[in-house]
C-alpha cells in the first residue's frame, strides 16, 4: 500500500477551496446570454469550443491531489444537475462555490460546522418551497420554444426545432440529437415504431424507385426463432393467401428453403410478403418482440410459451395499417394493439427505467418507451465546421433537457431572479442558535451570485444590477443582459425551468455543506520518478568493456 499524505482543519479546507475556486473560475465565465466560450484541448483532433458548464467542469483535473478533491466535489454538483435536469450546471457550480467560500470563512471564525450545515439545509428547504409556489405551468408551444431558446444561449432556431419536435412526438416521446452532414439543421419525425433492421432480401421490394417495401393493412408474424423449414410455415401462408392481405415476418432469421419459397411466391405475385430480422439481441430482443406484439395486437411466437409455428392461426398475428421496410429500417405505423395493453406496457417500462442503475439500459428502455408512446424525433444539427457542429449540438442537448424539465415542473423568471427573490424570504427564518442563523445567511448571500455573475459576464457591475432588481417588488422584474434593459423577464421570454433552478440549489447546497464539514483530507503521496526506467543504478550491472580499444 502506498504512503498517504494527510491534511487537517484550516490547511485541508484552504487547499480544497483553492481547487473549488479554479473549477468555479473556469465554469462561471459561461453563464448567461453574454457568457464567454471556453476552449478545451483534446489529446487528438482540433480543440473543442464550448459554452456548456458541465463540459468544462468534466475536463478539469488538477495536479495537486487536495485541490483536485475540492474541484471534483464541485464537478459532481454540475454532473448531478445535468443528469437530473439537463441544464443549470453553471448556476449550480456558482452557488456551490459561493456557499463553500462563505462557509469556510465562518468555520475559520470558530463556528460549529454541523450547525452551519443545519442552517444551510433549513434555508434550502425554504427556497425550494418558494420556487415551487411561484412556478408557472408551461402550456403553449411559444413558451416551450422560449425555454429552448434561453437554454441554447439565445438561439431562437434551436428553440423552435425543439418546440416542433415535442409537438409532434409528445412530451414523453424520444428526441434524439445527431450531427448532420450538411450546413442546415433539420428535424425528422418517425411516426409509429421504427427499429434498425431492413429487409432480408431485396426481392421483397414493392416500390422499386425508393427501394422500399410498402404494405398497407398487413398481418405481422412475430417469431423468436429462425425460420428455415417450409413445412412449419405452410398452414399459415395458405390462410394469409386466402385473406388477401400482405404478410410481414419478423424472425431471428429467415433462410434456406423458407426464404427461397417466400421470394418465389412474392415474385410470382401470389403472396405479398416480406421478411425482416428481429431487432436487438438476447433478452432485449425478447422484450422488443413483445413490444411489437403488444403494439400490433398479436402474439410473439415463442417456444417458452409452448406455441409452435405450425399451430399458429390468423388471429394470433399482429395487424398494422402500414408497414414500410427499407434496406436499414422497418417502420410499423398504427398497429392494431389495444390502448389499455399499450398503456400497461408503457407503465411497466417506466418502472424499469426508475429501477435500473445502468445508463446504457436506461437509454435503451427510453428508446423502447418512445417507440410505444408515439414516435421518435431526430434533430440533425448542421454547421460549417466540425467544431461548430459539436458546439451547437451541446447547446441543442442542453435546450432539449431544459425544455423537458419546464414541461414537467413549470417555469420561473430567468436571469437568476427567482433565486434572488427567494433570498428575500430567508430573512425571517427562525433558528435555534446564531451558528444556524449564519448558515441561513450563507445561503441568502449565495443566492445573489448567479444574477451577479450574469451581469458581470455582460460587462456590468453585478452589485448595482442586483440592488436595482431588489428595489422593485414585482416577482418577474429583472435585468435583461442581452439588451441591457430592466423589465418583466417572463413577458420578455427570459425564463428558467423550475426543476433546473430547484436541482441547482439542492445539489449545490448538498455538496457545499459536505465540504464545509470536512476536517481531514487523505491523498496518496505521488511516487518519485527516478528516471532510470526500473534498472538498478550504475548501468544495470554491466561490467567494464574489457580492453576494447578503438
Curated annotation (Swiss-Prot):
It is an enzyme of class 5 (isomerase). The keyword Protein biosynthesis does not apply. One of its GO terms (cellular component) is GroEL-GroES complex. Pfam families: Cpn60_TCP1 (PF00118). Coiled coil: none annotated. It comes from the Bacteria. Induction: Not induced by heat shock. ATP binds at residues 30-33, 51, 87-91, 415, 496. It catalyses: ATP + H2O + a folded polypeptide = ADP + phosphate + an unfolded polypeptide. GO terms for molecular function: ATP binding; ATP-dependent protein folding chaperone; isomerase activity; unfolded protein binding. It is found in: Cytoplasm. One of its GO terms (biological process) is response to heat. Its main location: cytoplasm. Keywords: ATP-binding, Chaperone, Cytoplasm, Isomerase, Nucleotide-binding. Its EC number is 5.6.1.7. Forms a cylinder of 14 subunits composed of two heptameric rings stacked back-to-back. Interacts with the co-chaperonin GroES. Belongs to the chaperonin (HSP60) family. Together with its co-chaperonin GroES, plays an essential role in assisting protein folding. The GroEL-GroES system forms a nano-cage that allows encapsulation of the non-native substrate proteins and provides a physical environment optimized to promote and accelerate protein folding. This is Chaperonin GroEL 2.
